[in-house]
Structure formats: structure tokens, C-alpha cells
């Protein structure tokens, strides 16, 4: 019987993460699962120090949950097996690595090392799928704001049109590829991908 700390995001999958946790329990009946709501964790360093010896971690959420975990724990992640149980609405990362829906959690340690990074306003971020810079990033940000208000379904086409016509202003960007720095002014769109899925 193995011990697993299941870090779950209750907002993942448009709020369906609780159902996915029940699926996980039935998939791993012979193991000991300890569930922790990621939204309640304020100090990952202290949280990891309190983990039972020999325990592994399962991240239960979507692409955003995984991305947030990786950035919040960049320099303090424990030396243990880290698994991923996709329970988001898109699960692009899971598709990229061939994880099947309803299958047991997949070991992801090899995928989360040496991730690409982006620096925005002086703050560095790692990403596991891709990032949207420009109107794409603007639309995602506005969509997240609307989703947070709970005003129904988010219409990204309307957000993009309003952004292009009235709100979004192109900005400058410095992009470094293979050690070579490139500077661009009035950038409208600069997506950067590590994964295969965009959208």
C-alpha cells in the first residue's frame, strides 16, 4: 500500500474536480490517499516538510492547475514521484503525453524539469503547454475575469473583437530563442508553445 498526497483544485474542470477525485479513489483502492485542497495551501515549503516519508504527489486538476503548481513550487519541490490526474476542461498536457481519460495517474517528473520560461514585468514564469502574449493573452485574462464573476459562458470571439477595436494596445517584447535576443515593438500576438495544442 503506497501513500499519495492528492493536491486538487476544486475549481478545475469548471468545478467538477470533486467527481474526478471520487474516480481517483476507485482507481487506487489499494493505496492510501490524503486529499489537500490546493487553494488552502499558503506555504508549499511547510506543506512538503509535513509530508509522510516515502509519499508521492498526485496533482488533480487541469492544465492551469498543473502550471500554477509548477510555478509555486519551482525551487522547493520535494524529491519524490509526482503524478498527474487530469481533471480540467481541456487537459492539453495530458493529451500531449498520451494520458488516457479514466486511466490511473501518470508519472510526470521527466516532463517538469527544465521547462521554458517567460519574464513578464520582471517576474519569471515557467510553462508546461504554451503562453499567449498579446491579444491572445489579453483574451485569456479577460475570459478568466468573466469566468470568476460567474456571468455565464465566456465568449472569446466577443472579447477579441472588443479588445481589437477598443481595449488592447500592442506592446513591446524581447524574445530570446537559443540565446539570441530579438526586440519587437507593437506586438499583437506572440504565442510560444512547448505542447502541441493551442487554443
Q: How would you label these PLM feature ranges?
A:
Residues 62-63, 88:
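Gly/Ser-rich catalytic serine loop of serine hydrolases
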Residues 42, 64-67, 113, 159:
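Short, contiguous clusters of charged residues that form electrostatic/catalytic patches at enzyme active sites
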Residues 196-199:
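Short, intrinsically disordered, charge-balanced linker/junction segments flanking boundaries
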Residues 61-62, 132:
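Helix N-cap/beta->alpha junction signal
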Residues 1-60, 67, 71-76:
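ATP/NTP phosphate-donor binding region
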Residues 66-69, 91-93:
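Short active-site-adjacent helix-start/loop capping segments
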Residues 5-8, 35-38, 75-192:
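Catalytic core of DAGKc-family lipid kinases
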Amino acid at each position: 500500500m503506497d501513500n499519495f498526497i492528492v493536491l486538487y483544485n476544486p475549481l478545475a474542470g469548471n468545478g467538477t474536480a470533486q467527481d474526478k477525485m471520487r474516480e481517483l479513489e476507485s482507481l487506487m483502492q489499494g493505496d492510501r490517499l490524503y486529499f489537500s485542497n490546493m487553494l488552502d495551501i499558503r506555504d508549499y515549503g511547510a506543506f512538503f516538510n509535513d509530508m509522510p516519508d516515502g509519499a508521492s504527489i498526485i496533482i488533480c486538476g487541469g492544465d492551469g492547475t498543473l502550471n500554477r503548481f509548477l510555478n509555486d513550487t519551482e525551487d522547493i519541490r520535494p524529491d519524490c514521484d509526482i503524478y498527474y490526474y487530469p481533471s480540467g476542461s481541456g487537459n492539453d498536457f495530458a493529451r500531449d503525453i498520451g494520458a488516457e481519460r479514466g486511466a490511473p495517474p501518470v508519472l510526470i517528473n521527466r516532463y517538469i524539469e527544465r521547462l521554458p520560461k517567460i519574464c513578464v514585468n520582471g517576474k519569471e514564469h515557467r510553462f508546461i503547454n504554451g503562453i499567449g502574449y498579446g491579444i491572445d493573452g489579453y483574451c485569456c485574462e479577460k475570459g478568466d475575469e468573466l469566468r470568476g464573476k460567474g456571468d455565464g459562458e465566456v465568449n472569446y470571439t466577443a472579447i477579441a473583437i472588443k479588445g481589437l477595436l477598443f481595449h488592447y494596445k500592442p506592446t513591446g517584447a524581447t524574445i530570446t530563442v537559443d540565446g539570441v535576443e530579438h526586440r519587437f515593438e507593437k506586438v499583437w500576438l506572440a504565442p510560444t508553445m512547448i505542447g502541441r495544442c493551442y487554443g
